């Protein structure tokens, strides 16, 4: 009788553990539908904003509403897809003076932890690998919305922003754009489709 009770207790604990794990939802970025964006802006000589985006990237995220500390994000970016709406400038930004996409074709971000700062928002801690350098960064995240889509799927959307320092990634030529070009504001908007 005691053995049966122990066995039943172990089964219940296992079931509870599995149900807790099942609460985490896995999402893929909606790249095909173009409902994901990575934009940036940087000051040009301190007189105006130079704006652009990375047009080719992919990513996934795991969302656990009950245990937000388990939330995870992974993103891979094609550095050569940088687009600032000016062909000659983009060629220069892709060159060895800046992103050097021939030697460093991919940038990536992988989260290490998440801290909730209120309902539907928090700080995503992780590592950004760019231009051959990996640095810890924090991204402020807010959930935009969630719910079913017209095609039988389920979606969840977030936006986030952070500030990068080009010298942290050995882009010393950033001084060519003026001292205020050291800081790059990065903004992302992501809609994920639940798997």
Question: How does the language model describe each region?
Answer:
Residues 4, 17-22:
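Hydrophobic membrane-targeting alpha-helices
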Residues 1-10:
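Bacterial N-terminal signal peptides that target proteins for export
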Residues 22-195:
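Low-complexity, acidic/polar, glycine-enriched regions of mature
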Residues 9-19:
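Bacterial N-terminal signal peptides
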């Amino acid at each position: 009788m005691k053995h049966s009770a122990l066995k039943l207790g172990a089964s219940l604990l296992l079931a509870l553990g599995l149900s807790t794990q099942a609460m985490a939802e896995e999402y893929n970025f909606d790249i095909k539908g173009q409902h994901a964006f990575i934009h940036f802006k940087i000051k040009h000589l301190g007189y105006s904003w130079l704006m652009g985006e990375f047009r080719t990237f992919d990513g996934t995220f795991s969302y656990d509403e009950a245990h937000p500390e388990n939330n995870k994000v992974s993103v891979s970016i094609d550095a050569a897809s940088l687009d600032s709406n000016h062909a000659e400038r983009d060629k220069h930004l892709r060159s060895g003076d800046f992103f050097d996409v021939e030697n460093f074709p991919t940038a990536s971000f992988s989260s290490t932890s998440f801290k909730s700062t209120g309902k539907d928002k928090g700080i995503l801690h992780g590592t950004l690998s760019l231009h051959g350098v990996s640095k810890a960064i924090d991204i402020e995240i807010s959930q935009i919305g969630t719910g079913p889509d017209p095609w039988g799927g389920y979606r969840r959307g977030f936006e986030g922003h952070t500030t990068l320092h080009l010298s942290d990634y050995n882009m010393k030529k950033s001084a060519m754009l003026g001292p205020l070009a050291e800081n790059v504001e990065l903004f992302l908007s992501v809609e994920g489709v639940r798997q």
